[in-house]
Amino acid sequence: MSNKLFRLDAGYQQYDWGKIGSSSAVAQFAAHSDPSVQIEQDKPYAELWMGTHSKMPSYNHESKESLRDIISKNPSAMLGKDIIDKFHATNELPFLFKVLSIEKVLSIQAHPDKALGKILHAQDPKNYPDDNHKPEMAIAVTDFEGFCGFKPLQEIADELKRIPELRNIVGEETSRNFIENIQPSAQKGSPEDEQNKKLLQAVFSRVMNASDDKIKIQARSLVERSKNSPSDFNKPDLPELIQRLNKQFPDDVGLFCGCLLLNHCRLNAGEAIFLRAKDPHAYISGDIMECMAASDNVVRAGFTPKFKDVKNLVSMLTYTYDPVEKQKMQPLKFDRSSGNGKSVLYNPPIEEFAVLETTFDEKLGQRHFEGVDGPSILITTKGNGYIKADGQKLKAEPGFVFFIAPHLPVDLEAEDEAFTTYRAFVEPN
């Protein structure tokens, strides 16, 4: 068997927020790719992990050897010398590729950058198991909604004026100081911009450090307001969102730090957002492809029963305040492929990964891809077809995952009209 292209078995996580039973794409993919997986219809299936992360590594489908071990035996062939030199790793991929199926809101969270990741890992390896940063990209496979980054300053000022419950938590002095002193049109990086960020940090800190009793009282009042006076809110979808998330996490601080301070983002299938390290975000519902730097570090803020590290969270965030449209990514044309179907590239402004989506709208269509200068992982998400490389022709069905070595030309062939694949890869430049 060639060691340049081979099928992988990917593990799955059953976090509470995952879609239930067969409604989950994660469950469907896991069961279709491994007939021994019996879907439990009352259990959540949240994440499919594809990569070398030690928490849930992928395995060669035939030999059952871990991808991590396969790479460590021949890193120059599996990663490429330039990738080894750049990321200083000889047994792991610099990215982690996932499918997420989201039924309930995930915790509002942010991820440390590289410098802070090393510090937190050294201080508290239990809660911060990695020393790396974790920028992420999410591509919607179905309709998706989430929180991403702080709202523009004027929107937050309007919330403080219109929603007494938020003002009660933030406090009169901090609220007034924010409303009167923000400069929404400040240039990025200017002293005025830095002052804006300090004002926003003060508001967020007051919310995150409010007592549980205060949050509980004000949350119940906020939910009643959303039912009885929906016009008090500056966005028409906010009252419904508050009520829905309150059913999932009653009286939670996330109703304030999420619904009222963060952008509420909706993506149609094919749209994507990039989430920088140290930017607050949370996924609310939908199915997504997610790619990230290889880390599992999370600093949580709300909508979670898990450990909340409020002190580090408040101090580490960037406090950028862009509208949600600025965080969306435009797919790019991918010039190194030809033939039937369509390939688009999602290329975030970081060095660890990019993701290529390929779709076919006709049976028996074929598309050729030149080799890329680093390792890849490819998953089929819809339809049936084949992946061909290095003299092999392997069946590709929903949930089937493959490793592709550097510099290897690949062909995809559609057996069905709606054949779709996603390919995460890294290159040195």
Swiss-Prot record:
Zn(2+) binds at residues 109, 111, 136, 281. Pathway: Nucleotide-sugar biosynthesis; GDP-alpha-D-mannose biosynthesis; alpha-D-mannose 1-phosphate from D-fructose 6-phosphate: step 1/2. Binds 1 zinc ion per subunit. Its cofactor is Zn(2+). InterPro entries: Man6P_Isoase-1, Mannose-6-P_Isomerase, Pmannose_isomerase-type1_CS, PMI_typeI_C, PMI_typeI_cat, PMI_typeI_hel, RmlC-like_jellyroll, RmlC_Cupin_sf. Keywords: Acetylation, Cytoplasm, Isomerase, Metal-binding, Phosphoprotein, Zinc. The keyword Cell wall biogenesis/degradation does not apply. Induction: By D-mannose. It comes from the Eukaryota. Its main location: cytoplasm. GO terms for cellular component: cytoplasm; cytosol; nucleus. PANTHER family: MANNOSE-6-PHOSPHATE ISOMERASE. The gene is PMI40. GO terms for molecular function: mannose-6-phosphate isomerase activity; zinc ion binding. The modification Phosphoserine is found at residue 107. Involved in the synthesis of the GDP-mannose and dolichol-phosphate-mannose required for a number of critical mannosyl transfer reactions. The active site is at 300. Its EC number is 5.3.1.8. This is Mannose-6-phosphate isomerase. The modification N-acetylserine is found at residue 2. It is found in: Cytoplasm.
